[in-house]
Amino acid sequence: METTVFLSNRSQAVRLPKAVALPENVKRVEVIAVGRTRIITPAGETWDEWFDGNSVSADFMDNREQPGMQERESF
């Protein structure tokens, strides 16, 4: 979804369409810069939704190919 970037009191601002608006109780956000990309998330909640979300299925990596144990010199 595209939107507009504009100047407000000599600072950049982004107009969020209703479809992607933040909840009304969000008063502060964090902006994470990844190259030219900007990720806007409610302040203090950056990883909460990720960890609270669905976890992997019970059979995740059941058939993982793992190399055998290596013999190493002790120090």
UniProtKB/Swiss-Prot annotation:
Record domain SpoVT-AbrB: where: 3-45
Keywords: DNA-binding, Plasmid
Alphabetized InterPro entries for the sequence: Anti_VapB2-like, SpoVT-AbrB_dom, SpoVT-AbrB_sf, VapB_TA_antitoxins
Entry's Gene Ontology molecular function annotations: DNA binding
Keyword DNA-binding: yes
SUPFAM superfamilies: AbrB/MazE/MraZ-like
Gene3D superfamilies reported for this sequence: 2.10.260.10
UniProt organism field: Escherichia coli (strain K12)
PROSITE patterns: SPOVT_ABRB
Protein name: Uncharacterized protein in traD-traI intergenic region
Family: Belongs to the VapB family.
